[in-house]
Every structure is written in C-alpha cells, then in structure tokens.
Amino acid sequence: RMTFCISSQVGCALKCAFCATGAMGFARNLSVSEIAGQVRELALLDPPVRATNIVFMGMGEPLMNWKAVEHVLTVLNDPKGFGIGARHITVSTVGVLPGIVALGKRKEQFRLALSIHAPSDALRGELMPVNIKYPLADVIQAAAEFDRRVTFEYVMLGGVNDKPEHADHLAKLARDCGAFMNLIPLHPGGALGFTPTPAKQ
C-alpha cells in the first residue's frame, strides 16, 4: 500500500491558525498538469512503486480549485490515466459546501475528508476563519448527505481542542453522520503558539 499526498494550490487563503501553509497566504491555483504531474513525478522517483491511494491533503484547499481538481480526479481514476480506484482517492476540505455538493454529484465513489478540528462553532471559529462562511452545523449536514464514506480530520492541539468534553462532543458528531475519525498529531513546524497533544493522552 502506497499513499501519495498531493497539493492543489500554491499557498492557501484560509489562514487556519495551526497551519504553516495558511501563514504563507495564497499565491495561485495549480493547473491540471501540475496537480497530476505530482503523481507522475512521485512514481518516477521509484518506478516499481505504484500509488494505491491518493489524498488531496497537501498544500491548498482543493475545493477552491474545483475546476482543475475535478479534471484531475478523472485522470487519476481513468484506466487510460493512472487507473486508481475512486474509493482510493480522497479529497480533503475545510467544508467548502458548493464543492462538496459538486463532488457528491460525481458518479464515481470518491472519498471525502472534512477538516473539523473543533467540535463547536466557537472554538472552530477561533481556529478556522472559514467557519464564519461555512459553519460547523452546515459542514456536518453536508457530511450526512454525502452518501459515501466521510472521514473527519482532527489535528490535536495541546490544551486547546483535546479535552475530554471535546472528545465526547466530537464522538457524537461523528456518530450522528456515520463518519470515520482521523486524529492527527500536530506537526510543530510553523504552528506558532500551539503544542502537540502528548502521545499518551
């Protein structure tokens, strides 16, 4: 099993407080060839290694470059392209609702990952300015209506979003819409003012 993590933009406009890419600001969208080319270049680094999974979890917000990302999804999945099964391709988003709807309309079973990172609007709004435009309740509703496997992504921030009450609330949100959970250790590089949750916790 080999997962390739690819980017959709240079920088990011969303300014999530814990993200080094967000601190860079947004430069531009990547083209179809630039996005698909990442998969090609990674494969060429070690030709015997073939990608079994692709995740749009690198730099940028994929659903804010939907026109290019949608084309790349076709290239990745097509037998004449990379021939990777749709269920092995995951698009990650902070919750850009029009893009989630568009992804859900595709006939292929592409996976969706939602960057939640807080179980309440108050805390999520502090960490993720995009929560003003796309509130948590609307994002959760979109997950419930997606009709395919959805994963909640949750970066663990020491003393910020990792208390027992956060876990209880998060578990309820995930259970109510049948989502999987992916708890992510914080990479300290670039996340000024935050510390990782201790591994034991």
Task: Indicate where each model-derived feature is located.
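N-terminal [4Fe-4S]-dependent radical SAM core
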Residues: 1-8, 39-49
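Canonical Radical SAM [4Fe-4S] cluster-binding loop centered on the CxxxCxxC motif
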Residues: 2-33
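Alpha-helical scaffold elements adjacent to nucleotide-binding pockets in ATP/GTP-utilizing enzyme cores
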Residues: 34, 38, 71-72
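Conserved AdoMet/S-adenosylmethionine-binding subsite of the radical SAM
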Residues: 43-200
